[in-house]
From Swiss-Prot:
Disulfide pattern: none
Region named Disordered: 216-287
Feature: compositional bias, Low complexity: 238-287
SMART domains linked: KH
Originating species: Mycobacterium sp. (strain KMS)
Pfam families membership: KH_2, Ribosomal_S3_C
Cellular component terms (Gene Ontology): cytosolic small ribosomal subunit
Record-annotated KH type-2 domain positions: 38-106
Protein name in UniProt: Small ribosomal subunit protein uS3
SUPFAM superfamilies recorded: Prokaryotic type KH domain (KH-domain type II), Ribosomal protein S3 C-terminal domain
């Protein structure tokens, strides 16, 4: 189900791409172990750097590592000392030449991994979990490319004895739609009561034919034309609404205009009948 599976793996090869790009035959398991070790090394050594993603690409005698970070200054260090140290550690681990590329993330509020890390840091600093979740949602929804977000926290929330899960959602987050561009992030907050897992899903529109649809930015029903009432005045309909033909000034005026000729005709008919009766009495006085 789309609600249970990792969104990246669910859409792999459809709307998302592989984060490790290389080919191996007999060394496949060794390369997989190396990739896990590289990501673990960067995650533990650069916790405050705000790393959003790590991409690994291998050639015959070289390993290229792309680090997407919101704080490139921490990764580079003063005069590049930190970057040199990271490169040396990676070369020692892989025993190959390492090309290290540090890329800056322009909008960290719209990256799920960075949003989850921000919420986890607030939870570690004893901020109320509901306040941290709502603040993250408000910051993400201000971005023009974000159409919906869901944030979930699981663990001993608020120091409760029994663990539980709570989530907040705003906008659309279609987890089971394969063409939907869903960004997913997971981070664990270390608190005095134990670990609290933070998961974030961010919906950024649909991808059709390799291009993101711009129609997802418009709210539902925005293209539907509005029906306007004609400019001319029209009498209100009577019936279930409780409005009768004479309950308004316009209705009373219309009713009075229609009743005046009818009353005049009735009066003329009465006078004619009275005149005919008087003539009959004059012609037959004895009767």
């Amino acid at each position: 189900m789309g609600q249970k599976i990792n969104p990246h793996g669910f859409r792999l090869g459809i709307t998302t791409d592989w984060k490790s790009r290389w080919y191996a035959d007999k060394q496949y398991k060794d390369y997989v172990k190396e990739d896990v070790a590289i990501r673990r090394l960067l995650a533990t050594g650069l916790e405050r750097a705000g790393i959003a993603d790590v991409e690994i690409e291998r050639t015959r005698d070289r390993v290229r590592v792309d680090i997407h970070t919101a704080r490139p200054g921490i990764v580079i260090g003063r005069r590049g000392t930190e970057a040199d140290r990271i490169r040396a550690d990676l070369e020692k681990l892989t025993k190959k030449q390492v090309q290290l590329n540090i890329l800056e993330v322009k909008n960290p509020e719209s990256v799920a991994q960075l949003v989850a890390q921000g919420v986890a840091e607030q939870l570690s600093n004893r901020v109320a979990f509901r306040r941290a979740m709502r603040k993250a949602i408000q910051s993400a929804m201000r971005q023009p490319n974000v159409k919906g977000i869901r944030v979930q926290c699981s663990g001993r929330l608020g120091g409760a004895e029994m663990s539980r899960s709570e989530f907040y959602r705003e906008g659309r987050v279609p987890l089971h739609t394969l063409r939907a561009d869903i960004d997913y992030g997971l981070y664990e907050a270390k608190t005095t009561f134990g670990r609290i897992g933070v998961k974030v899903w961010i919906y950024k529109g649909d991808i059709v034919g390799g291009k993101r649809e711009l129609t997802a930015a418009a709210p539902a029903g925005a293209d539907r034309p509005r029906r306007e009432r004609p400019s001319g005045s029209r009498p209100r309909r009577s019936g279930a609404s409780g409005t009768t033909a004479t309950s308004t000034d316009a209705g009373r005026a219309a009713s009075g205009t229609q009743e005046a000729p009818a009353a005049a005709e009735a009066a003329a008919g009465t006078e004619a009948a009275a005149g005919a009766a008087a003539e009959t009495t004059t012609q037959n006085p004895g009767s």
